[in-house]
């Protein structure tokens, strides 16, 4: 049994390194910028505050039985949000973590949700690169996986 655990750990280790590097970069950025939970700032700049944050609030309301997933009565005279829900990745399984967050901390929790998504983006990209380019050197695959996860941030 112990041997199986060691084999599994050895297989998973290369996949965990890109995620760990991404997490370190994100945490250092959050700390240096004083972004919640390491300070009072938030990452709700520009369109994040106008588009993404209200969708997180709408998703929170849906998960707690207070709203429809596809229609929002709080925007104008009501609006169909199905395109927005899909375009802004609101149906990501990682957003289920939002269920655990109190509604008054949605804006602050966006930094944590973003960090979690970025870590898994780097792991997924490493898996893709490892599958498509198995002969590519490990540091190169790791570097590109980390760069991919950070390119949208």
Where are these regions (language model features)?
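Start-transfer (signal-anchor) and selected internal transmembrane alpha helices
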Residues: 1-35
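Short linear motifs in intrinsically disordered/low-complexity regions
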Residues: 4-7, 73, 131
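Juxtamembrane/transmembrane-helix boundary motifs in multi-pass membrane proteins
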Residues: 5, 9-13, 102-106, 110, ...
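Short hydrophobic "helix-edge" motifs at membrane interfaces and signal-peptide entry regions
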Residues: 8, 77, 140-142
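Hydrophobic alpha-helical transmembrane segments
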Residues: 16-20, 112, 141-146
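Membrane-interface coil-to-helix junctions
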Residues: 26-125, 146-153
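Transmembrane-helix signature of polytopic, membrane-embedded enzymes
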Residues: 126-149
């Amino acid at each position: 049994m112990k041997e199986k655990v060691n084999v599994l750990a050895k297989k998973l280790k290369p996949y965990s390194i890109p995620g760990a590097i991404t997490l370190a970069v994100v945490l250092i950025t959050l700390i240096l910028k004083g972004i919640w939970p390491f300070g009072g700032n938030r990452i709700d700049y520009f369109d994040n505050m106008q588009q993404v944050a209200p969708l997180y609030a709408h998703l929170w309301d849906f998960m707690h039985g207070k709203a429809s997933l596809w229609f929002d009565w709080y925007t104008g005279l009501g609006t169909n949000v199905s395109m927005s829900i899909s375009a802004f990745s609101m149906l990501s399984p990682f957003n289920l973590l939002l269920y655990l967050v109190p509604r008054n901390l949605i804006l602050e929790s966006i930094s944590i949700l973003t960090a979690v998504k970025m870590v898994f983006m780097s792991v997924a990209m490493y898996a893709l690169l490892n599958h498509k380019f198995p002969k590519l050197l490990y540091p190169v695959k790791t570097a590109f996986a980390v760069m991919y996860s950070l390119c949208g941030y």
